[in-house]
Amino acid sequence: DAKVSEKFAKSTKRGPLNYVKSAIGEYLRYRSQRYKITTPNGVIAEKAFIIACGNASQYGNNAYIAPNADMHDGLIDVTVVLPITPFDTAILGLLLFSKHIDQDTNIISFRTPSLTIEREREGIIHLDGEPIMMDDRIDIVCHPLSLNVFSRLRTPDKGNFFTNIESSFWDFINSIRSELNV
């Protein structure tokens, strides 16, 4: 995700098509890394494709990486995407836009007030929409209710095509994937 952002930021062309081209190119070159995630509740050691941390549910553009996130609970929502196949990528894309990514078998999700991520090497991360270089150790802490923001009144979410699809459909997809071992 961070490499795609970096490539897209350096590109002279804009628009969704150029973003998709950047994403496909980076996906084909990217190799998952082994990560160690330490929280107050324990340690997780996994090889991962993406680790996303935040206190809001959206990546942006109606892509929900942490559908149950609450900006007021003082917790960081962590979504770990385990190594995936091209087939998994298509399914995860649908789940990302339907607010059901946390139901996929290739996802580990949890909440914590703080965490440390240790990875094999330093590299680019995606921080609030910007690609930046970080060390092989990243410490993350939530400072609850510390940012004051002015905004319009919130209106009820009426959903969209994807959010109105029944979750049983995703159970069906996951059962097929399990049977096919993908």
Where would I find each of the regions flagged by the language model?
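Long C-terminal subdomains/extensions of small-metabolite kinases
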Residues: D1-V182
